[in-house]
């Protein structure tokens, strides 16, 4: 495929990707795709460096949304016990442990539809406290108003996560209580407040190839591109609508990572949920395809994650260095 042969061109950020072109990239011969993705990665990022972030559920369960993949939804009987918002000191203690363990970004997630006024101040205190430790800060709190986004930025928020989940045409199969446009509007408010955008999606939900390509095209059409792009593999939870979904073929997952790297060359592409079910070899292929960020810690919100020593053992065997505090993970554009 001629497009994959021009690495210098592929390494330039563009936001005019079409589904047709993205599909040609996704379906390219596997060796050509991986070679191109790794070449783009080396042009735009340190070749053997991966960012390590840690994610903490600061408010678990009882969510009013009906996301078909989520065990925190109040719509499904998954046996998860809902909890109130964690105390500030407990969150900061967890952040300190994350930093001591090598994490350079600390992410805080709350299971609710939107940030409520009564919780704004304590959330801002959490952000300020983590920021004072020298780590990057990230939260995922559902929908926001413009004033809330500005308040979070003033507290020191670096990144806001709000995933698109899937392609627009596949979205109604996954969730009915929030529209696709709601998600786009929230991301626009985040960007307008000067906060970096973290948005991606979930694969392995029974979607077809076209939906995966559609999701990636939506993300790569954002101007500017999201700074962080988490690619999650569904962790199927019993008693949720998507609990019987079959895992996505590993090669298809790697194709998704590689295509994300090519379409969004300067974004951090994160291996997120689902790594616990992946072999070391599959994860290594994902790093080869351009993934350069992971979550460390035993849990991602409420789903299992590889133990941190397993991750660093894998890094050692692959010659990968964890990103240090203050490093950006990108090579300056020429």
UniProtKB/Swiss-Prot annotation:
Pathway: Cofactor biosynthesis; biotin biosynthesis; biotin from 7,8-diaminononanoate: step 2/2
UniProt-annotated binding residues for [4Fe-4S] cluster: 63, 67, 70
Keyword Iron-sulfur set for record: yes
Cofactor notes: Binds 1 [4Fe-4S] cluster. The cluster is coordinated with 3 cysteines and an exchangeable S-adenosyl-L-methionine.
Names of the cofactor(s): [4Fe-4S] cluster; [2Fe-2S] cluster
UniProt-listed Gene3D superfamilies: Aldolase class I
EC number: 2.8.1.6
Ranges where the Radical SAM core domain occurs: 48-275
Keywords linked to the UniProt accession: 2Fe-2S, 4Fe-4S, Biotin biosynthesis, Iron, Iron-sulfur, Metal-binding, S-adenosyl-L-methionine, Transferase
UniProt xrefs under InterPro entries: Aldolase_TIM (IPR013785), BATS_dom (IPR010722), Biotin_synth/BioAB (IPR002684), Biotin_synthase (IPR024177), Elp3/MiaA/NifB-like_rSAM (IPR006638), rSAM (IPR007197)
SUPFAM superfamilies attached to this UniProt entry: Radical SAM enzymes (SSF102114)
Family annotation (Pfam families): BATS (PF06968), Radical_SAM (PF04055)
Entry's Gene Ontology BP terms: biotin biosynthetic process
GO MF entry, a single one: 4 iron, 4 sulfur cluster binding
Sequence positions that bind [2Fe-2S] cluster: 107, 138, 198, 270
Key word Lipid biosynthesis present: no
Reaction equations catalysed: (4R,5S)-dethiobiotin + (sulfur carrier)-SH + 2 reduced [2Fe-2S]-[ferredoxin] + 2 S-adenosyl-L-methionine = (sulfur carrier)-H + biotin + 2 5'-deoxyadenosine + 2 L-methionine + 2 oxidized [2Fe-2S]-[ferredoxin]
Function of the molecule: Catalyzes the conversion of dethiobiotin (DTB) to biotin by the insertion of a sulfur atom into dethiobiotin via a radical-based mechanism.
Family of the protein in this entry: Belongs to the radical SAM superfamily. Biotin synthase family.
PANTHER family, per the entry: BIOTIN SYNTHASE (PTHR22976), BIOTIN SYNTHASE, MITOCHONDRIAL (PTHR22976:SF2)
Self-association and partners: Homodimer.
Protein name per UniProt: Biotin synthase
Organism name: Maricaulis maris (strain MCS10) (Caulobacter maris)
Gene that this sequence comes from: bioB
């Amino acid at each position: 495929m001629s497009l994959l042969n021009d690495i210098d061109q592929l390494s330039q950020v563009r936001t005019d990707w079409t589904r047709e072109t993205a599909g040609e990239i996704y379906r390219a011969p596997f060796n050509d795709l991986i070679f191109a993705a790794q070449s783009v990665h080396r042009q735009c990022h340190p070749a053997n460096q991966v960012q390590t972030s840690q994610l903490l559920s600061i408010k678990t369960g009882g969510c009013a949304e009906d996301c078909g993949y989520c065990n925190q939804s109040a719509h499904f009987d998954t046996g998860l016990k809902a909890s109130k918002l964690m105390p500030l000191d407990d969150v900061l203690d967890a952040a300190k442990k994350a930093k001591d363990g090598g994490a350079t970004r600390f992410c805080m997630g709350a299971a609710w539809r939107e940030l409520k006024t009564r919780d704004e101040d304590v959330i801002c205190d959490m952000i300020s406290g983590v920021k004072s430790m020298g780590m990057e800060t990230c939260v995922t709190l559902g929908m926001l108003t413009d004033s809330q986004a500005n308040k979070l930025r003033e507290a020191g928020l670096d990144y806001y996560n709000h995933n698109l989940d899937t392609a627009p045409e596949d979205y109604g199969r996954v969730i009915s209580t929030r529209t696709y446009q709601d998600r786009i509007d929230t991301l626009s408010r985040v960007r307008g407040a000067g906060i970096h955008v973290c948005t991606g999606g979930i694969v392995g939900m029974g979607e077809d190839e076209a939906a995966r390509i559609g999701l990636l095209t939506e993300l790569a059409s954002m101007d500017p591109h999201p700074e962080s792009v988490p690619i999650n593999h569904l962790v199927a939870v019993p008693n949720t609508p998507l609990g019987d979904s079959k895992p996505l073929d590993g090669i298809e997952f790697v194709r998704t990572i590689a295509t994300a790297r090519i379409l969004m060359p300067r974004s951090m592409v994160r291996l997120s949920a689902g790594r616990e079910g992946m072999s070391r070899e599959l994860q290594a292929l994902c790093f080869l395809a351009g993934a350069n960020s992971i979550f460390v810690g035993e849990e991602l919100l409420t789903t299992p994650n590889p133990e941190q020593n397993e991750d660093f053992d894998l890094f050692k065997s692959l010659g990968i260095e964890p990103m240090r505090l203050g490093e950006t993970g990108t090579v300056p554009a020429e």
